[in-house]
Amino acid sequence: TSRRQRQMCIRDRAHDPELLILDEATAGLDPVVRGELLDLLLDFIQDERHSIVMSSHITADLEQIADSIAYLHNGQLLFQENKDDLLQEYGVLHCGEDVLTSLPAGLVVFTRRGAYGCESLVRERRTVQELLPEAVCDAARLDDIMRFFSGRDAQ
């Protein structure tokens, strides 16, 4: 298949490396080609001897391919965690200020206050959902987590 040929071509040119270091490898690619490249990278890491270190601003790609996420912002490492744990752990809570203050300390990481209430990044999303069944607590996407941690959405 053409996919197999492309994969063999990449391996031949790279001399069958154990580690690929990629900087913005999918930037500027159309969605079809980007998807094909991600599939090739996923095929590559099926061999447990192979690893990829990939920097990207396209967080959807990281959600699809990464096992671990390290987030650097202004030269500072803000977090490094297993991707699946990160996405299961955090939620985005939408509620009023009064509801927010009723949560135990440590669950609210960052809050953005607006005219219609608060939007907060919370730890232990499932616990928050049990404590506040009337509130909306969505699963956080990697974009959400990074925006809150960088302070862009926090107040």
Model region roles, listed by residue range:
Residues 1-6, 10:
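Single conserved hydrophobic/aromatic residue that forms the stacking wall/gate
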Residues 14-18:
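A short, proline-enriched helix->beta-strand linker immediately N-terminal to the Walker B motif
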Residues 20-24:
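Catalytic Walker B motif of ABC-type/P-loop ATPase nucleotide-binding domains
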Residues 26-27, 59:
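Short loop immediately C-terminal to the Walker-B catalytic DE motif
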Residues 31-33:
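Helix N-cap at the start of a conserved alpha-helix in ABC-type nucleotide-binding domains
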Residues 80-81:
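ABC ATPase "signature
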Residues 108-155:
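C-terminal coupling/interaction segments
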